[in-house]
Amino acid sequence: MPEHGTAFDTPRADGNGVRAKTLRGLLVARELDTARLARSLTTRELAGQMTMSPAMLNRVMTGRRVPTALEIGGLCGLLDIDPARRPHLYRLTADADLTEWIIRPGAGTSALGAIEEVADTATWLDPLLIPRPLRTAAYHHALGHPIGDHQSPEPAAPPTDRFLLHPRALTHPAIPADVMGEQLLHLCHTAPNTIRLLPATFPPHPGFRVLHIDHFPPVVHIDHHGTHVILESPDSTAAHTTLLRAATTAAATAEHTRRTLTDLAARTGTVG
């Protein structure tokens, strides 16, 4: 619930609706503001303890202003941020002006997880494979991943992701027919209203997803053989967001997609 009492109790957006300058700044702001709320502090009260104006602290808590090294240290102390967590926030603060991310294999996925956590929804587009959130464990294993590396998801309620699949993704030479049939059935029953098929004539494009974050431009995530590339600058995401709009316009309805998937599953002998 919003706090009451001062004009700066709850961080506010700029007039254009975009708060944070960069995604790193947004992650810092969200973590600090979550800690502030956990301690039941208004921004005015915290600003007083930091000897900052409420307006200045409000900009920090929305990511519109990156805290200095001294300020982030003081905020972590006052908000009782876990000491083991502080170096991560210090790094994000130091790199807050950067607008692209490359997370290489072995580097961990905590940064990606943090970005996913602040996203409200995501839209996936994949021309060749079933996106990971929709895969059965058997399908994932057939692609060469270790057993136990993936669990078949339960139907999502409420669904927050949307999926645009190219027909090419519904066949794969490495996937046995029975596994693909099970996968097709799984698509029919797992969040069926979130999946839409593209026409076969739609030009294939390397897979990606667009993360939609409140009060922030669309963020593009590309998984390139385990290396995660994250783009946030509108200049660098424009080609992907334009393609996504075109794909969304061209895609079949969810109902038509569900019928198509059911028919394909029936041809494999898995419907009964």
Question: For the regions a protein language model found, what residue spans apply to each?
Answer:
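C-terminal regulatory/effector modules of DNA-binding transcriptional regulators
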Residues: 177, 181-272
